[in-house]
A protein has these predicted regions:
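Bacterial N-terminal signal peptides that target proteins for export
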Residues: 1-10
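Carbohydrate-interacting regions of secretory-pathway proteins
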Residues: 23-397
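Compositionally biased regions
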Residues: 6-7, 19, 28
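A general, composition-driven signal for non-globular sequence regions
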Residues: 9, 15, 39-41
């Protein structure tokens, strides 16, 4: 009996033994198998479940909403303990809190978070002064600086024309917003920002970085490519960013107010070690081996000389990710034990396993399709013969 062909039989039992485990998270040997750029199968039951997050509530101009349960709250309207002046570490800010909002004291300087923040989803609400003064860039001007380097413009553009790449929600000096969705001055506006920093390695750009912005719920920056740190008057130049930096709010000489500021850290991209999405060949192979190792450990816990089936199925599942030699050998051993028992069954008990055996054929076909076992595996032919001998493929009239 060939080792690979023994392996084929093992999988049949997935239908019986693993049915309970897979009922809610999917089935093994179902969707397309892992490939050179995807460590997970399609509809992979072994893939980690998304974490649970309790959603917050939406804000209105009159009332701030509540952050989601996993948000890091930077300002809740009560204190500035997470903020400092941009002059140096530990220097207290001169900005003040009024009616649940922090307000810029003109010419007191920028304010920044004490902690450094990298890729994130950021929520911030701001309001220009109710009393309209100035025009163009001189009216209700401030800015939200991601990592202290990329400015998402804050400006009272309500009936106030200015240059396009300086409008509210512009990536300042780089890209105008898709729309002007501001409310009248004095009312709170909301920004929801998804920020991904540029990534460089050995002086080479791997990812330019991107930003998406919603202004009052309206998409105004659609996965906009970053061109480096923003600035005034000069063309931005791409370059490496640190992994994280402080969030800064600009003092541009106007008493702009901010409230309800929170963020959610984002997971790493594939290019920096993340395991979702389109991975490199090398990263995919490493992750597939890690997944297989976890499944093999799981299979070991199922060892039972009186019933080799559970361990057999789980171990076979690991081979879809990594055809480890020892795992193949152990799988063949378990398959032999199962097949020997199957061959000794009386006809009535064999008939009772019809659906299981037919499912096993499907599993064998899956493993052949994805080159886990050879097409001429002996057990595959044996299973087909059993099905043929009992006319199990014959449709009832």
């Amino acid at each position: 009996m060939k080792m690979h062909s023994s392996l084929t039989t093992l999988c049949a039992l997935l239908w019986l033994v693993s049915a309970g485990r897979a009922a809610n998270t999917g089935s093994a040997f179902y969707g397309d198998a892992p490939d050179e750029h995807h460590p997970w199968a399609v509809h992979d039951r072994n893939r980690p479940q998304p974490k649970l997050v309790t959603p917050g509530t939406f804000s209105s101009p009159e009332q701030p909403g509540k952050p989601p349960s996993d948000a890091v709250v930077l300002f809740d309207g009560t204190d500035l303990s997470k903020w400092e002046a941009d002059e140096g570490s530990g220097v207290p800010t001169k900005w003040v809190i009024k009616d649940g909002a922090m307000e810029c004291v003109p010419h007191s300087g920028y304010i920044r978070t004490r902690e450094s923040i990298g890729d994130c989803q950021l929520h911030v609400e701001w309001a220009a002064p109710s009393r309209v003064e100035g025009e163009s860039q001189g009216r209700g001007n401030s800015g939200v600086f991601m990592m202290g380097l990329v400015e998402i413009q804050v400006l009272d553009d309500y009936n106030n024309p200015t240059y396009a790449d300086g409008f509210a929600a512009a990536v300042y000096g780089q890209n105008p917003p898709l729309a002007n969705a501001l409310r009248p001055p004095g009312e709170f506006q909301s920004y929801d920002i998804v920020f991904r920093r540029p990534i460089f390695k050995d002086g080479r750009e791997l990812d330019p970085g991107w930003v998406t912005v919603f202004e009052n719920g309206v998409l105004v920056q659609d996965h906009t490519r970053l061109e480096g740190p923003t600035g005034h008057g000069a063309r931005s130049k791409p370059g490496p960013f640190p992994e994280a930096g402080p969030l800064k709010l600009q003092d541009h000489g106007n008493p702009v107010r901010y409230r309800n500021i929170w963020y959610r850290p984002l997971p790493p991209r594939a290019i920096e070690g993340g395991t979702d999405g389109y991975l490199s060949v090398e990263a995919t192979q490493v992750k597939r081996q890690q997944i297989a190792a976890v499944i093999r450990q799981d299979a070991e816990k199922l060892a039972d000389p009186a019933n080799p089936l559970p361990q057999l199925l789980r171990l076979a599942e690991s081979l879809v990710y990594d055809a480890d030699g020892d795992a193949l050998e152990k799988t063949a051993q378990l398959a032999n034990e199962y097949l020997a028992n199957l061959q000794q069954l009386p006809a009535d008990k064999l008939e009772a396993r019809k659906d299981q055996i037919k499912h096993l054929r499907d599993v064998c076909n899956y493993l052949v399709r994805f080159n886990v076992i050879p097409a001429d595996a002996e057990q595959r032919a044996e299973i087909e013969q059993i099905i043929k001998d009992h006319n199990w493929d014959q449709k009832k009239k």
